[in-house]
Amino acid sequence: MLTKTAYMVATAHLDTVWRWTIADTVEKFIPDTLSKNFDLIEKYPNYMFNFEGAYRYELIEEYYPRAFDQIRRYVKTNRWNPAGSEYENGDVNIPSPEAITRNILLGNNYFYEKFKKKSKDIFLPDCFGFGAQLPQIINDAGLLGFSTQKLSWGSVSYTHLTLP
């Protein structure tokens, strides 16, 4: 009998450049994300968390240094994964390949400097498409691939579904 194993890893995506202010990100969304995931890590021994964007880690380091130290401890024990490779999530359709490459370089350099670990993929959870140059950029950056959660936007309506 063939058995298969599925691995699920929790993640959070914070848009620091979209619909709310940096102050909201720093004062509301970062503390909420950290406290909930710190609690889950402590409660569940197999819980692992992916968090992306070196810029958000810089904000944590600046505004919540004790939490940043806790993240470092979790990274060392493989409970927390600096994900995504990029400094900041952004569009990958319009910017030049050079801009995307530098974004990856800045992000992974930060991860290595702070955690002695680099991300192995580019995490694009909220893009409105993926440019044709992306596979070459990913390959040239030495990444294994990319992860996403949104392959289309608004193409499926779930309004007819009801909860039990």
Identify the role of each PLM range.
Residues 1-98, 102, 111:
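N-terminal catalytic cores of secreted or lumenal carbohydrate-active enzymes
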Residues 100-133, 137-140:
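CE4/NodB-like, metal-dependent polysaccharide N-deacetylase domain
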